[in-house]
Amino acid sequence: MYVRNLTGSFRFSLSFLLCFCLFVPSIYAIDGVYHAPYGIDDLYEIQATERSPRDPVAGDTVYIKITTWPIESGQTAWVTWTKNGVNQAAVGAAFKYNSGNNTYWEANLGTFAKGDVISYTVHGNKDGANEKVIGPFTFTVTGWESVSSISSITDNTNRVVLNAVPNTGTLKPKINLSFTADDVLRVQVSPTGTGTLSSGLSNYTVSDTASTTWLTTSKLKVKVDKNPFKLSVYKPDGTTLIARQYDSTTNRNIAWLTNGSTIIDKVEDHFYSPASEEFFGFGEHYNNFRKRGNDVDTYVFNQYKNQNDRTYMAIPFMLNSSGYGIFVNSTYYSKFRLATERTDMFSFTADTGGSAASMLDYYFIYGNDLKNVVSNYANITGKPTALPKWAFGLWMSANEWDRQTKVNTAINNANSNNIPATAVVLEQWSDENTFYIFNDATYTPKTGSAAHAYTDFTFPTSGRWTDPKAMADNVHNNGMKLVLWQVPIQKWTSTPYTQKDNDEAYMTAQNYAVGNGSGGQYRIPSGQWFENSLLLDFTNTAAKNWWMSKRAYLFDGVGIDGFKTDGGEMVWGRSNTFSNGKKGNEMRNQYPNEYVKAYNEYARSKKADAVSFSRSGTQGAQANQIFWSGDQESTFGAFQQAVNAGLTASMSGVPYWSWDMAGFTGTYPTAELYKRATEMAAFAPVMQFHSESNGSSGINEERSPWNAQARTGDNTIISHFAKYTNTRMNLLPYIYSEAKMASDTGVPMMRAMALEYPKDTNTYGLTQQYMFGGNLLIAPVMNQGETNKSIYLPQGDWIDFWFGAQRPGGRTISYTAGIDDLPVFVKFGSILPMNLNAQYQVGGTIGNSLTSYTNLAFRIYPLGTTTYDWNDDIGGSVKTITSTEQYGLNKETVTVPAINSTKTLQVFTTKPSSVTVGGSVMTEYSTLTALTGASTGWYYDTVQKFTYVKLGSSASAQSVVLNGVNKVEYEAEFGVQSGVSTNTNHAGYTGTGFVDGFETLGDNVAFDVSVKAAGTYTMKVRYSSGAGNGSRAIYVNNTKVTDLALPQTTSWDTWGTATFSVSLSTGLNTVKVSYDGTSSLGINFDNIAIVEQ
């Protein structure tokens, strides 16, 4: 966003502000009185002239807040009013305070009963003369009613209707239960019985008794207790409770706020929640990841910096650690209270707009796990729209790039520094009036109904944009795409601007703007971003088509590739009207969806691989492609909040997420922050840098690596940035495959640990590590000065992505992460499709080509039988790679699908005795260079522990067998060392080095090792003992098991292996090789191996 919010202690309508600005004080008069019952319906800021509360409930004390002006003695304010049509005694307003040119008053009308109708008028005068009046205003008092019992049920074969009895009043509520899937229950409650109830599947059976009714599908059993009423949901066994409503004898469950007859203002439900339950999701949230103990608002809001519990993306969908989710099917404001009213209860309440036909409508979503719950939610609200491959490279953006020369310079800088970008985003490209015409373009204005073609414009050589089409061509010729900024407003300005004025006149005449509820156009309130501007009604098809026609030339003539759709949090007030028949209070959350959807669909109608990049939305937003986390400062705290936002967004079904890495605004990031942010952003769904301009100060604020290097003085920033962006391009085949899985299933790419491992309670509070796709665990360093990172590894075996060190899971480890290091772990059993450069280097220069591979590679970490579905967009289909590990037979088999190009397997095993493809023995090469020059063959890398198997193009599947292999050794240099050091000064070691100085009493190296099953294993110790025969004590799980003889080796450059049998327990074991009282001689220590017998 490039135009900042205006703030103030309170806000008035623009006309009211103008009356203050133009006021010339009268000495003996009152010039005005003002009261606005709802203000602008801002959830977070109550204006000084509102009614309190805005919507009174029985028992509330009602205050009428008033202002008069100017400030003069002798003024009086009061309220005249009626109750249920009967005149009441006038209520004088008490003076509260003076501020600026205004006096503020407050009148106490008292409390009321449900059903009371109050009409009031506000008055003010001075010394009993010159009276000013505003009003009348009306409100109807409501009160809570709830379901008490069920009188009867009706099975309609595709839905069951429960006829309910309320605890009070004369309404005849109906509860409609239906199933949209075997594990998804939809609950609709019509308090008046007049709402439109939906049908579902005929996939259930009903069992009814006088006291209970059971609804049964293959995956759920739903119990209805009739008196008192309560819903409970069980697993298919009918005894394992998943969730239940709160006992209505203690606290109401299903309830509604009503006047008793024709108004339903709010609807809600309450569920029992044991203290062990956690709550996640609710949209994009920046503060607490675990929401228990919090109230969460579903309210789209533009908070510039320091978002905390406010959000651009509010989604009424939550995940519960007990294995289910609840989606409240409403775009009105709603609130979730999560163990705040009662410590063993959560509830959700939704506004309704007041109609008698209003309903509570929510889905109870179950699944095999929480990922399945998110997938089921996507089935209801829409699957994520698939992204083109270019969306997953680096996006470059800066508000300093306000002219063509700067864009070309940025492209040149990226290329010259080997930084592979795939997108350029421009915010400061357009004039400040139409927002669709390039700055400094000259043209003849058209009527508001007409659209410009690119040829209508002339671009002066002295202007900022001398040839936009040539610029777009340059972007494309460098393998990148061009995205332009947009906002959904028709801007108001105090000075004329012909084209804008023509557009506004036509927009107004055609009723294309959002209405104000009084026959005119809604204008954004004073004090808000783009105040007094019109807002396009994107629910109006004609309006949408007209709006987009103005922007057609950007595709047709310039050749852009998408839009950055900023803003959208611009609907203030409940009375605004839309073409779809909805009003402002129902459209505030929904408006960004309509806006972004319009741009997204239009862009993709112009180019199949176009995208939209947006900030705000609500349920279903995932169908509108990419979202970023809004405007944040360049601090470690904001970094942490951004990652939290990404995790909560992903828990809410939004898979394609990004942030302005290292922050958008504020103090320029330090080198440390910039590097740490780079590391994390390289493993985010979408990677981008962007920044706010510092205006005319002359200080360049762009967050590009070349500017960051210049600003911080750290001359390693560019190379560091290049390493991580190239690593991202190495992983692009994996990232793009995971993205396809996200669009197919709704399961996000960036997964909170609690989403991936919901049964492991250790994961619930982890917000500084996450899964990137199904195979990679990312643990960014997010605290200033931190170099030892605590990382929780869930059960299973994990491998350090960079170094190959093995780490058994089910525990927290400490990882040394220097400022240039990002901890990344791979699960055993993973298969990673990659694109590596000519030297097979991860992080080496690879370029930004999306249509070819330099070295297509598949990294395989064997464990049992695993498969991976690789999205081969170049080859045109999804292909499945299968790994079958049989270490008991000393064999690993990889089934490679038909791929019409050369590819290389990188299999994480010990060195094979031989490798075959299709039964034929392959040629072994002694160096990677030799293999690179060959068409096929294999090579073993003793450092990385990968067997490289190079395969040619094949029109059929290929079976590759590695013979004589076992699980990779545990390297001594990665063990827990005491009294020893590491070295590389002798040849023949494996891994990255060996343990040296292993020569005095107490020296030891400990390993955490993992085995699939308890039993006897062969343990091998690889060592060098050039000075004579040595020995070491071996401890397993703190028990000494043997003194291992280590016969002399020929020299310190030769290595021996000592072997013995050892009993190991299932899972994690600790093995320590120690110099104790029975040990002798100094040795060099390379590794240990655990071999199945």
Swiss-Prot record:
Keyword Ribosomal protein: no
Catalytic residues as annotated in Swiss-Prot or TrEMBL: D566 (nucleophile), E569, D631 (proton donor)
Notes on how activity is controlled: Strongly inhibited by Hg(2+) and moderately inhibited by Cu(2+) and Pb(2+). Other metal ions, Tris and EDTA have almost no effects.
Stored InterPro entries: CBM6, Cellulose-bd_IV, Gal_mutarotase_sf_dom, Galactose-bd-like_sf, Glyco_hydro_31_C, Glyco_hydro_31_N_dom, Glyco_hydro_31_TIM, Glyco_hydro_b
Reactions accelerated catalytically: 2 alpha-isomaltosyl-(1->4)-D-maltotriose = alpha-isomaltosyl-(1->3)-alpha-isomaltosyl-(1->4)-D-maltotriose + D-maltotriose; alpha-isomaltosyl-(1->3)-alpha-isomaltosyl-(1->4)-D-maltotriose = cyclobis-(1->3)-alpha-D-isomaltosyl + D-maltotriose
pH dependence: Optimum pH is 6.0. Stable in the pH range 4.5 to 9.0.
Main localization of the protein described in the UniProt heading: secreted
GO molecular function per UniProt: carbohydrate binding; glycosyltransferase activity; hydrolase activity, hydrolyzing O-glycosyl compounds
Entry keyword Transferase: yes
Domain CBM6: 968-1091
Short name of any one Pfam family annotated for the protein: CBM_35
EC number, UniProt record: 2.4.1.387
Gene3D superfamilies per UniProt: Galactose-binding domain-like, Glycosidases, glycosyl hydrolase (family 31), Golgi alpha-mannosidase II, Immunoglobulins
Any one biological process term the GO annotation gives: carbohydrate metabolic process
Expression induction: Part of the ctsUVWXYZ gene cluster, which contains genes for synthesis and transport of CTS.
Alphabetized CDD domains for the sequence: CBM35_Lmo2446-like, GH31_N, GH31_transferase_CtsY
Signal peptide (UniProt feature, chain positions): 1-29
GO cellular component entries: extracellular region
Job of this protein: Glycosyltransferase involved, together with CtsZ, in the conversion of alpha-1,4-glucan into a cyclic tetrasaccharide (CTS) constructed from four alpha-glucopyranosyl residues. Catalyzes the alpha-(1->3) transfer of the isomaltosyl moiety of alpha-isomaltosyl-(1->4)-D-maltotriose to another alpha-isomaltosyl-(1->4)-D-maltotriose, resulting in alpha-isomaltosyl-(1->3)-alpha-isomaltosyl-alpha-(1->4)-maltotriose formation. In addition, the enzyme catalyzes the intramolecular cyclization of the product, generating the cyclic tetrasaccharide cyclobis-(1->6)-alpha-nigerosyl.
This protein's name: Isomaltosyltransferase
Provenance organism: Sporosarcina globispora (Bacillus globisporus)
Designated gene of the protein: ctsY
